[in-house]
Regions:
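Internal intein/HINT superfamily modules and their associated LAGLIDADG
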Residues: 1-302
Length: 302
């Protein structure tokens, strides 16, 4: 269902939109590339009649992000066709916007230098235009600011911003059992099946001075996919997940660098609440590294 009508892709309309997009900064293009690498698509599929159906777009449950893209590119905002997950469960309502024609070619040209995961898709997309002279662009040569803009978009698409609250079972000096609610802890995770991207992000963040706790691996087994009781029901091997993790006071400097670029209200709210937690007591570990004590050091800013 169309919620907001955009400009039809004609040569005249595309040229008008492109003239406006030329005023956008490199950092905005890097941020957009992060979103496209995360939850976007760059498609060169053909129609059943053999015609090219080139499209660049994004599909999410966060309407404000899709609406921002739609307003920026003057495209239509629609709800995605209702479908079911492969495991048979219903999806949440998703919103989608896509761009085609000369407008899409220009957008692809602008985000291509900043893409990390979908570089081959972008090259294939541009090569599908017969008159397009493909140019070599530097790969993964972002400045620190460009990388942070890309990383912010990618993290809003693929990352998790949490404040963890843990209840622990403890015993006091009298031997009595009681429930102890530990102070909240900031936790950031970036999860993807592509190990090389996760490790690249870790290396780049550490070079910029951020402390990344670890990159973990979640081994995934076989599971059932498809609606129960149908012919589509099958057993598949899920890909392993790779997880970049920061917590506590280590996550907060990263949040401060990401916040100026962020546009997803749901995640902005979580980041602002996380930055309102103050870690103040320090201690030395047996390895000589300085860490923040979590359980006894969090106070709330008034």
């Amino acid at each position: 269902m169309i919620l907001k009508q955009g400009l039809k892709s004609t040569k005249e309309n595309d040229e008008k939109v492109i003239s406006k997009l030329k005023n956008m900064s490199d950092l905005t293009w890097a941020y957009i590339a992060g979103w496209i690498d995360g939850d976007g698509f760059i498609s060169t599929l053909k129609t059943k009649h053999g015609h090219n159906a080139r499209r660049i777009g994004i599909k999410l449950i966060d309407r404000e992000i899709i609406e921002w893209f739609a307003d920026l590119f003057h495209t239509s905002l629609t709800t995605a066709t209702e479908d079911r997950r492969e495991d048979g469960y219903n999806r949440k309502t998703q919103y989608i916007t896509g761009v085609s024609g000369l407008r899409a070619r220009y957008i692809c040209e602008q985000i291509r230098p900043y893409l990390i995961e979908k570089t081959k898709d972008a090259e294939k997309f541009l090569r599908s235009f017969e008159d397009y002279p493909i140019k070599t662009v530097p790969y993964m040569q972002h400045t620190d600011k460009e990388f942070m803009a890309w990383f912010t978009g990618y993290s809003e698409a693929e990352g998790t911003f949490r404040i963890s609250k843990t209840c622990k079972n403890k015993i006091n000096s009298k031997g009595e059992h009681y429930k102890y609610m530990a102070p909240p802890e900031v936790k950031f995770e970036l999860v993807n099946t592509n190990e090389s991207i996760i490790r690249y992000c870790k290396t780049r963040l550490e070079k910029m001075g951020f402390f990344v706790q670890k990159v973990g691996v979640v081994k995934r087994n076989y599971s059932f996919m498809g609606k129960k009781g149908t012919k589509d029901r099958r057993v598949v091997k899920k890909k392993d997940l790779f997880r970049l993790f920061l917590a506590g006071s280590s996550a907060q400097p990263l949040y401060r660098s990401m916040l100026p670029f962020m546009r997803c209200e749901r995640k902005i709210s979580k980041v602002e609440k996380s930055l309102a937690l103050v870690y103040r007591n320090k201690r030395r570990t047996k390895y000589g590294e300085k860490r923040t004590t979590v359980e006894s050091s969090i106070v709330y800013m008034k």
